[in-house]
Amino acid sequence: MDLDFFTQSLAEICDHSLVAPGRPLDCTIIINPAAGGFTIGSKWKSHTRTLTEYRQKAQANPQRTMSESVNSILTDGRGSGGNITRALIDEAQKKPDIFYLIISAGGDGTHCEIMYALYNAPAHVRSNMAVLRLPLGTGNDGADSASMAKVLDLLINPVHIEFSPAIQLTTAYGGPASGNDLFLAFNILSVGLDAFVTHMTNKMKGKVAGDSYKLWVDIAALFYDRFYKVDFLDVRALDDKNQEILSFREKLLLLAMGVSGHRTYGSQQNILPDDRNVCCVKQMPIHRKLAIKSQVTKGRHTNNREVIILNAHRIEFSGSHPILAQMDGETVLLQPEDFPSALELTAPVIPLLKM
């Protein structure tokens, strides 16, 4: 890993970027040096080749006006990415003529910290900012693309700013989870088996070599209902006008809602393979679980009889047993007192670059 090469390459690309043309650009790279894209040799070599290629491609664009030289800041632990972003938000409030580009150079955890800070920023400040999420983690489900080249294309080609919603989990007032912080996801928020896999993977981090997520997917497919009772959930789906789309009562292994369709989680597991943003998976025998598990990886599960897939703005659900929820890798245990709970798209708030 050569951080000097990394920052110099991005600085040179930003110097010729087409983001916010006609305005001074302030570019800050927030780097998590512990991210897999830096520490895993094969990934770093691939990123080095791509950065070299795009450093050369950027030269075809004219040099742009920068407010100052590109700044790079290393994170130093959990929450650091959010703290750095909040400092940039404070600075941006004082300099409305400048466009602030935050490049998140880390994994999905770093991306989430940055976007959480942006979510809470004043709207007039967010309108002068954008975040670019490089695929420098191991899974990269929350990056702008799993391909480094496709993300860097957003710097050297004409782009516009598009505001993306988040997904918020709300729980019953007075329940055990209601006093916690805001529950937000910027990719997929899920309840049930996947949240259990995420919870166990988090517990194993640093203790087991290799991809423990895939290990726990295999374990959960066989034994999840030994850990948590899979019982009926009452589910109600609503559109953005609060009109009911569908309601049902099923024993569910999984309930997942994405910011949009065409989204992956768990290291590119293709749970939302088309335009629809909600996927529910019913309880089923073990042999069916094993069959569907392999189909989810390739996004071929949508026509299975155990799968309910739809578009919704809000999903309300209630049950009578504890169940885990996960928000982009962070988990919370929902108790019966937390129901009814809901997953809902927020207003569009996260400024992203789009071609």
Language-model features: locations:
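ATP/NTP phosphate-donor binding region
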Residues: M1-A105, C112-A123
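ATP/nucleoside-binding phosphotransfer catalytic cores, i.e., glycine-rich phosphate-binding loops
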Residues: D2-P21, I40, E244, Y265-M355
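Hydrophobic/aromatic beta-strand patches that form the interior of the parallel beta-sheet core
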Residues: T28, I103, L132-L134, L255, ...
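Short glycine-rich anion-binding loops that position phosphate/pyrophosphate groups of nucleotides
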Residues: A35, G107-T110, L136-G139, V191, ...
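A residue-level signal for conserved active-site and pocket-lining positions in enzyme catalytic cores
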Residues: G81, V197, L255, V278, ...
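Short glycine-/acidic-enriched loop or helix-start segments at secondary-structure transitions
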Residues: E113-M115, A143-D144, G266-S267
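Catalytic core of DAGKc-family lipid kinases
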Residues: N120, H124-L254
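Glycine-rich phosphate/pyrophosphate-binding beta-alpha loops
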Residues: S190, D194, L254-Q268, T331
